């Protein structure tokens, strides 16, 4: 098992950090850490953004480091070309131990309030919640979804609003597609959902999600596995799909098929520049477009499945 990792560090303007982090996450296939965001706060209103962020990616020490550095530098050069006048420093490489890597991202993951009542708390923290808080304990491990990223926050905020708007006696079925850490599925249960299904194509993400479900005593209340969307039985009153824009468009027919009449569909993981691509992909007479929410460079869209004529 690898105990030493190559850490590649890039300093970049804050408004491009998410784009770089997404690229490095796909390139490394392991982990990415974004720093210089003051998350030592209980409300997103208190978060302070710095002008420059530091994005760190981790690779096995067996990797061809020169080849990886060249790929990353080429990506940074393309970013600079798209933003005239932008100067991006060359990446810095260092070697870290596994335990150092773990400490690095933990230092930047603090309790976070999302929406009106949701409080996301890492397992190593114990903040005093307000009486009506819905506390979700989380150890994200290598899976995406701490609640700090814009795409996850958008989903959580919209989920809370949708669930609060449901009739009191209704316990809706909820699907969390691309569950990552399991945070959306856990929030759905705590917000009053009945059947909750969480799926991800990444077995490691499913394992992390199951561990987080156990931390919150929700193992028996969420079906969590790698079942493909097309193989899931039944329909859902709420579907949360926080995945890449291109995948959302590809899965549009299946998502609509799994959404019950009158059900709500939340699409996230969409860069603002991909918004029209997704809007076109979901231009279906069975769906009513409801709204678009924006945070930073990211958007989330809400649709409702209309009754058949």
UniProtKB/Swiss-Prot annotation:
Major enzyme class: transferase
Superkingdom of origin: Bacteria
EC number: 2.1.1.-
Annotated Gene Ontology cellular component terms: cytoplasm
Residues annotated as binding S-adenosyl-L-methionine: 152, 178, 200, 242
Molecular function as annotated in GO: protein-lysine N-methyltransferase activity
Compartmental location: Cytoplasm
Reactions mediated catalytically: L-lysyl-[protein] + 3 S-adenosyl-L-methionine = N(6),N(6),N(6)-trimethyl-L-lysyl-[protein] + 3 S-adenosyl-L-homocysteine + 3 H(+)
Pfam family, one: PrmA
SUPFAM superfamilies according to UniProt: S-adenosyl-L-methionine-dependent methyltransferases
Keywords per UniProt: Cytoplasm, Methyltransferase, S-adenosyl-L-methionine, Transferase
Matching Gene3D superfamilies: Vaccinia Virus protein VP39
GO BP of this protein: methylation
Entry's family note: Belongs to the methyltransferase superfamily. PrmA family.
Functional summary from the UniProt entry: Methylates ribosomal protein L11.
HAMAP family tied to this protein: Methyltr_PrmA
Protein known as: Ribosomal protein L11 methyltransferase
Gene: prmA
């Amino acid at each position: 098992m690898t105990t030493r990792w190559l850490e590649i560090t890039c300093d970049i303007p804050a408004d491009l950090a998410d784009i770089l982090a997404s690229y490095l996450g796909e390139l490394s296939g392991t982990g990415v850490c974004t720093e210089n965001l003051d998350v030592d706060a209980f409300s997103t209103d208190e978060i302070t953004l710095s002008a420059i962020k530091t994005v760190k990616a981790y690779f096995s020490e067996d990797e061809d480091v020169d080849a990886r550095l060249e790929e990353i530098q080429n990506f940074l050069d393309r970013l600079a070309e798209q933003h005239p006048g932008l100067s991006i420093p060359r990446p810095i490489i260092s070697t870290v131990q596994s335990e150092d890597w773990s400490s690095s991202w933990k230092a930047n993951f603090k309790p976070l309030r999302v929406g009106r009542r949701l409080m996301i708390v890492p397992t190593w923290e114990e903040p005093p919640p307000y009486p009506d808080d819905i506390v979700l304990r989380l150890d994200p491990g290598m899976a995406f979804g701490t609640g700090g990223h814009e795409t996850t926050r958008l989903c959580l905020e919209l989920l809370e609003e949708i669930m609060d708007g449901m009739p009191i006696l209704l316990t809706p079925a909820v699907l969390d597609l691309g569950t990552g850490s399991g945070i959306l599925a856990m929030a759905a249960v705590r917000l009053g959902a009945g059947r909750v299904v969480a799926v991800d194509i990444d077995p490691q993400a499913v394992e992390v999600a199951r561990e987080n479900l156990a931390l919150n005593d929700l193992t028996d209340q969420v079906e969590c596995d790698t079942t493909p969307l097309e193989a899931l039985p039944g329909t859902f009153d709420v579907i949360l799909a926080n995945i890449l824009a291109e995948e959302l468009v590809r899965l549009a027919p299946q998502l609509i098929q799994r959404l019950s009449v009158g059900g709500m569909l939340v699409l996230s993981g969409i860069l603002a520049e991909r918004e029209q691509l997704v809007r076109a992909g979901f231009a279906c007479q069975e769906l009513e477009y409801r709204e678009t929410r924006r945070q930073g460079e990211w958007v989330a869209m809400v649709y409702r499945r209309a009754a058949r004529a």
